[in-house]
Amino acid sequence: MAQLCVALVAGEASGDILGSGLMRALKARHPQVRFIGVGGPLMEAEGMQSYFPMERLAVMGLVEVLGRLRELLKRRKALIQTLIAEKPDVFIGIDAPDFTLNIELKLRQAGIKTVHYVSPSVWAWRQKRVLKIREGCDLMLTLLPFEARFYEEQGVPVRFVGHPLADTIPLAADRQAARMALGLDAGPVVALMPGSRGGEVGRLGALFLDAAQRLVELIPGVHFVLPCANGARRAQLEQMLEGRELPLTLLDGQSHQALAACDAVLIASGTATLEAMLYKRPMVVAYRLAPLTYWILKRLVKSPYVSLPNLLAQRELVPELLQDAATSEALAQTLAPLVADGRQQTERFDEIHRTLRRDASNQAADAVLALLKDR
């Protein structure tokens, strides 16, 4: 077989992690493989020749995207032209669907095999995107099983590869070791995780702290840990803590240690709910959006649940308190019993963890190479 050339594009840190794992698995099977495209430091360390820094693609939020739209479109156009000229054996777009799906469509029209790794949330909203995916994508690699079922129904070639987090997080986390590392005592510990973005923490931070204040009355000797995503979030939360007497430890990052150490979690909807589930920690999920945003999303979103544990269980396994239902009293009263006994949740968490633990990088590499076997 001639030297394999694989093009990949990742747009953010999570994609860089996935991309580097996939590259490692491909190299194990094809030591002479050449990688081109756009990746971050982890992908570059695996041998990626990145055409420009991945950070140029990592923009969050509508306003930021609009501010950089001209640059993003220009980079995408240049990337398409370069890749058509290079003619790689396969192109793999990793997440970042608003950037990569268009590239896949153009490359597939030029006769290049295309793979999309990590499904956008088409099963929940903007379902028409599946038409673009079907047209532009030879193979979809999903991290979650219900996503694969959705694509099968829509006639899109798909492979469920499992979730890399399920591979890296142990089936049974050592609570005592995590507590020792964080300097925590033996009593009940609750993790508060109000999100990693400024807007989320602005809407949920004080609410979670109010709920914690109520939990102090309900659970004797309780202690709280709150991992801060970065310095800006820490400053934001320190301001919210002024004037409060709470037995609380702020952590810098260390969200995985906080989850390993705690007995239960009060958590914002998002990827963190998957992490909490993989650590087998009972949780209550809360979320608040700006009223207009919530009103619009309620009409657009087709999914009955917002949290990944419930989407994976296909039933209400964990309580979801959204918008006006998310009061400090309701959060405290719902979480308190779970601190003492959350087995109803955690037994199912263990089953789901085993379903997702499939050695994702190797599964993905095998699927990509199977697509190329006739090249």
Swiss-Prot record:
Pfam families: LpxB. InterPro entries: Glyco_trans_19. Keywords: Glycosyltransferase, Lipid A biosynthesis, Lipid biosynthesis, Lipid metabolism, Transferase. Pathway: Bacterial outer membrane biogenesis; LPS lipid A biosynthesis. GO terms for biological process: lipid A biosynthetic process. It catalyses: a lipid X + a UDP-2-N,3-O-bis[(3R)-3-hydroxyacyl]-alpha-D-glucosamine = a lipid A disaccharide + UDP + H(+). PANTHER family: LIPID-A-DISACCHARIDE SYNTHASE, LIPID-A-DISACCHARIDE SYNTHASE, MITOCHONDRIAL-RELATED. NCBIfam families: lpxB (TIGR00215). Condensation of UDP-2,3-diacylglucosamine and 2,3-diacylglucosamine-1-phosphate to form lipid A disaccharide, a precursor of lipid A, a phosphorylated glycolipid that anchors the lipopolysaccharide to the outer membrane of the cell. This is Lipid-A-disaccharide synthase. It comes from Pseudomonas putida (strain W619). The lineage of its organism: Bacteria, Pseudomonadati, Pseudomonadota, Gammaproteobacteria, Pseudomonadales.
